[in-house]
């Protein structure tokens, strides 16, 4: 990676974590294979030639903004301002691309966001989508540049700014094109958009529309009947806990058997509220402090390493199970999983070929399977 971004999440990782978490992934090959977002700042002539020769499409590009001076400043890379010219080179090679903006309050929002949206929408049809995600900060951030997270009013302003553009895109070509991260709706206290607004969820792997997708999977799996009768605790990040609780009430309206347990992220800081960044130690602490007596515990599969039952702090899932031998602890990845576990706990078992959505740099999520936040 040629950058030292103001908002780099890799630089905010706590010490003594799994070493692979500190690997920066600004690599167009990973972008093509796994949907990782890249900035294109480390691209040379040979890279563009290879992309053209092999037709590596689509790619996933972290734009952040289209103002050349501001982009170079935010990425701390003097040659980062050429993003529109670089996108043009991809287009000349017949390459399509998805884009994202990591939105930082007071930097690339407001008029700068308006400029970015205008520039990227003008690059259709090569530009396939634009995702806007809020900057994520942890308590381990040491970068001296002041960044703040969006509050309720700030998130509402972003939604209000983007919605007219979404309506314009739908009027022009029947799809939304511009998608906001679920966190904006959570922060603003608003409902996430209906599934139709996500156009098949082209940036689901980036965490865009996970909540609506999860609800849709639940609804598709739901059958008439009540909960299975087992007493279950549902571990989640604080952001999505209300959504999980609302679904649980459909099966257990009296709140007698299903208890959603929002876990504060003590490791990264309370401002980090997604399920996929919960570590094993924080989950264990929450279970020790839990007042309800339960038979089983559902944990987010997204908190486990891709293809391996290990949390971000290198705690194996088996170690968590060993600490609570009286509890059956199972990962849940999708809305269908969640429904199956709550409605038929005795027969629920997920053979996990993959850990669901796994956090990657720049506030993104990576392929290949659906997951739970």
Where are the regions that the model predicts?
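Short glycine-rich or small-residue beta-strand-to-loop segments that form or flank ligand, phosphate
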Residues: 100-102, 130, 299-303
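Short loop/turn and capping residues at structural boundaries
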Residues: 62, 101, 131, 331-333
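Structural preference for beta-strand elements that scaffold enzyme active sites
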Residues: 58-60, 96-98, 129-131, 177-179, ...
């Amino acid at each position: 990676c040629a950058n030292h971004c103001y908002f780099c999440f890799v630089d905010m990782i706590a010490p003594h974590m799994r070493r692979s978490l500190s690997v920066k992934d600004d690599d167009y090959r990973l972008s093509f294979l796994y949907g990782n977002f890249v900035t294109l700042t480390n691209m040379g002539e040979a890279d563009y030639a290879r992309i053209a020769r092999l037709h590596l499409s689509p790619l996933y590009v972290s734009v952040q903004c289209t103002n050349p001076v501001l982009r170079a400043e935010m990425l701390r890379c003097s040659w980062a301002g050429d993003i529109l010219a670089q996108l043009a080179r991809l287009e000349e090679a017949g390459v399509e691309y998805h884009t994202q903006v990591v939105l930082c309050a007071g930097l690339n929002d407001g008029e700068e966001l308006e400029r970015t949206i205008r520039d990227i929408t003008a690059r259709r049809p090569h530009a396939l989508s634009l995702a806007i995600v809020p900057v994520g900060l942890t308590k381990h951030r040491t970068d001296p540049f002041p960044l703040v997270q969006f509050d309720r009013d700030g998130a509402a302003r972003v939604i209000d700014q983007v919605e007219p553009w979404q309506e314009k895109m739908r009027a022009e070509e029947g799809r939304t094109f511009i998608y906001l991260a679920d966190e904006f709706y959570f922060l603003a206290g608003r409902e996430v958009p209906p599934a139709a607004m996500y156009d098949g969820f082209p940036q689901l792997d980036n965490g865009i529309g996970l909540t609506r997708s999860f609800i849709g999977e639940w609804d598709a799996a739901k059958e008439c009947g009540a909960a299975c009768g087992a007493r279950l605790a549902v571990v989640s990040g604080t952001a999505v806990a209300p959504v999980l609780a609302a679904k649980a009430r459909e099966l257990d309206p009296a709140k007698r058997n299903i208890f959603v347990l929002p876990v504060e992220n003590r490791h990264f800081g309370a401002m980090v509220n997604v399920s996929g960044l919960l570590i094993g130690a924080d989950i264990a602490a929450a279970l020790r402090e839990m007042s309800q007596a339960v038979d089983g515990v559902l944990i987010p599969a997204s908190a486990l390493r891709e293809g391996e039952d290990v949390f971000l702090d290198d705690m194996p899932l088996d170690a968590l199970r060993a600490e609570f031998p009286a509890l059956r602890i199972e990962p849940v990845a999708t809305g269908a999983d969640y429904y199956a576990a709550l409605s038929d706990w005795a027969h629920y078992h997920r053979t996990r070929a993959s850990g669901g959505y796994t956090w990657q740099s720049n506030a993104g999520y990576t392929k290949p399977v659906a997951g739970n936040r």
